[in-house]
């Protein structure tokens, strides 16, 4: 399927615009994280079939005229190993399904694949997380060379991962407009150059 033309761009003033008509991008939606962490577990508590719940949620969102979602995906906890190798599991399969279903409904997405907050919140009862976050705490993600390599590895594998529902790599999904590398990274005001290298 190959490269996907960019639907948006940033102008010289830092405003994100649609490539097609040059209008400012203005989307409305919310965070959505049923494929992982607390929402994944909550669906299990009520005996829900997660794929059907995704469809029902997206139908509600469309009825409310939502056109944007921030996909919070705890890959740093639930879908990687220490080196950042992508792990195939139900969380990833549900993310693929969610992306395909959102795409069908013309819902645009911001993908946030490194969340940094423990995926076991609020219960904190499961200690089986295998992800890179188990080895690299939030405050090491920007400066620690091993942590940076693990994140680079994870991001490359995730963005090149082929979605079986769409047949496209995540990097080529037309409705994923943005990728937020690290959710709420630790700030180091005494080392601004080190934060933006």
What residues fall within each predicted segment?
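Active-site mouth of glycoside hydrolases
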Residues: 7-197
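Boundary at the C-terminal end of the N-terminal hydrophobic targeting segment
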Residues: 2-4
């Amino acid at each position: 399927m190959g490269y996907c033309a960019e639907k948006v761009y940033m102008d010289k003033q830092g405003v994100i615009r649609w490539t097609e008509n040059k209008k400012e991008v203005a989307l409305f939606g919310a965070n959505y994280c049923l494929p992982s962490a607390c929402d994944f577990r909550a669906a299990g508590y009520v005996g829900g079939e997660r794929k059907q719940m995704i469809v029902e949620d997206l139908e509600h969102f469309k009825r409310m005229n939502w056109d944007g979602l921030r996909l919070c995906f705890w890959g740093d906890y639930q879908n990687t190993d220490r080196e950042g190798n992508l792990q195939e599991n139900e969380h990833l399969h549900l993310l693929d399904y969610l992306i395909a279903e959102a795409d069908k409904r013309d819902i645009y997405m911001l993908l946030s694949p490194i969340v940094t907050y423990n995926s076991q919140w609020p219960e904190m009862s499961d200690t089986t997380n295998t992800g890179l976050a188990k080895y690299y705490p939030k405050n090491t993600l920007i400066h620690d060379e091993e942590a940076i390599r693990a994140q680079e590895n994870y991001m490359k594998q995730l963005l090149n991962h082929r979605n079986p529902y769409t047949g496209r790599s995540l990097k080529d999904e037309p409705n994923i407009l943005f990728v937020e590398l690290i959710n709420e990274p630790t700030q180091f005001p005494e080392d601004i150059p080190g934060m933006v290298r």
